């Protein structure tokens, strides 16, 4: 089978959509090595190196015009390339499909991650929203099959983009295998020293932006007089400055450690060393950091109201994303109960097996095969 992918995010996004895209490509190579995989990459420069795949062919814009304007190539050039390749399936990994793909004879799949920009329009520039709405509606309309990464996402794309429910398959995403590997004591010591991590800490990992609601954790620390520091792993943003102002307001300047340059390979140890992973995001399409925490046997507190119960499972604790007292109580409950911590770790590891590489790879291949004669 010839399977082609929009690999822009795989090569140029370090987290989020990039992580998802790289994992799909890795899993297909690992579990179905007899297929040919074609990866459309709009830019050669500063590309992330993917896991080796013997049957991967990377395709770039060829004409001067498309090299100068790679976005035009993604939108209007890829369909012609697919016809030349005589591809069987094209999978848009980040909510987009190229124009006129329905006229190529190539079966198309699109992964829809979320509709957050519809729920929270004030968080996104107006021009960005308009473009993305059109791209999303088009992809849902012309795709032969739509993959939703959670039940919540399925509900949202039906509601906001009028997607045909009969075309939608829920295929959960996983996380990198590095989070499933045992971390030895030497590695823990190395990482703790590298980032000057305290002996005990709470943890948040991901984009440092308003929607992630990290302020709830800070307010909970103040409300509950919790003396364990919080470590926030994520790149510097304007929202980070808001958080620092809040810390000053509460007199908690030394209670939060910001790590802006953590290596991906160090993240498993950073998770493992934490007492609790806290993810109070007001809305997510899936929430990969929650799964990463489960895979490293770290107890999880997450927010209600979106899909995080799907990614975190029954062993995690959930609180209203605006309830400071509830968050404070949840943190204290886990910290005070060693038996609960042990149970959350064991049950979390078991639940994470649902998102194993093999399950995800087989579910994706089932979607592809069901499109073909």
Model-flagged regions — what are they?
Residues 1-373:
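Carbohydrate transferase catalytic cores enriched for Leloir-type hexosyltransferases
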């Amino acid at each position: 089978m010839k399977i082609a992918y929009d690999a822009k995010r795989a090569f140029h996004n370090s987290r989020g959509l990039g992580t998802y895209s790289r994992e799909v490509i890795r899993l297909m190579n690992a579990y179905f090595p007899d297929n040919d995989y074609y990866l459309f990459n709009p830019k050669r420069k500063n590309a992330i190196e993917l896991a080796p795949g013997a049957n991967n062919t990377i395709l770039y814009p060829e004409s001067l015009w498309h090299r100068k304007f790679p976005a035009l190539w993604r939108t209007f050039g890829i369909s012609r390339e697919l016809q030349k390749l005589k591809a069987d399936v094209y999978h848009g990994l980040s909510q987009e499909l190229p124009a006129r793909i329905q006229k190529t004879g190539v079966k198309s799949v699109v992964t829809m991650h979320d509709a957050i920009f519809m729920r929270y329009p004030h968080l996104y520039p107006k021009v960005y929203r308009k473009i993305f709405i059109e791209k999303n509606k088009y992809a849902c309309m012309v795709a032969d099959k739509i993959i939703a990464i959670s039940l919540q996402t399925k509900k949202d794309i039906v509601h906001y983009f009028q997607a045909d429910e009969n075309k939608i398959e829920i295929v959960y995403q996983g996380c990198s295998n590095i989070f499933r590997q045992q971390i030895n004591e030497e590695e823990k010591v190395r990482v703790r020293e590298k980032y000057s991590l305290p002996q005990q800490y709470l943890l948040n990992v991901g984009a440092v932006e308003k929607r992630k609601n990290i302020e709830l954790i800070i307010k909970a620390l103040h409300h509950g007089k919790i003396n364990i520091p919080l470590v926030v792993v994520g790149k510097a943003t304007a929202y980070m400055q808001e958080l620092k102002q809040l810390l000053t307001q509460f007199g908690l300047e030394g209670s939060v450690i910001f790590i802006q340059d953590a290596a991906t390979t160090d993240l498993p140890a950073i998770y493992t060393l934490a007492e609790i992973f806290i993810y109070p995001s007001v809305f997510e399409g899936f929430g990969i950091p929650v799964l990463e925490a489960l895979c490293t046997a770290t107890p999880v507190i997450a927010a209600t109201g979106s899909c995080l119960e799907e990614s975190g499972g029954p062993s995690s604790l959930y609180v209203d994303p605006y309830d400071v007292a509830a968050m404070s109580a949840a943190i204290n409950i886990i910290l005070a109960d060693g038996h609960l911590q042990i149970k959350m770790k064991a049950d979390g590891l078991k639940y994470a097996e649902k998102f194993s590489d093999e399950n995800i790879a087989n579910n994706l291949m089932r979607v592809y095969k069901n499109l073909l004669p």
